[in-house]
Amino acid sequence: MESTLEQHLNDTMKNPAIVGVLCTDQQGHNLGCRGSLSDEHGGVVSVLARQAATLTRDPTDPTPTVCLESDSGNILIRSHGTITVAVHKIAS
């Protein structure tokens, strides 16, 4: 699985609009990262995804997407089962 994850991270970074990507487990442990998102962001990313899920409680969409917006870009965070993914995109 590790080599597959590494390949997905590398493929994601090929998009010129993406400057960072991070995958964590449910405890915030880093599974892999590239670019502007690093090991130190894992815990925050995991907690944001978990807290957003408790806020929504929508049975039709149990896994909300968190979007942190700034003038320079967005960080999108979403959980997929036991893995949380964050993608840092520059503003277009």
What feature does the model see in each segment?
Residues M1-S92:
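Non-catalytic interaction/Regulatory regions outside core domains
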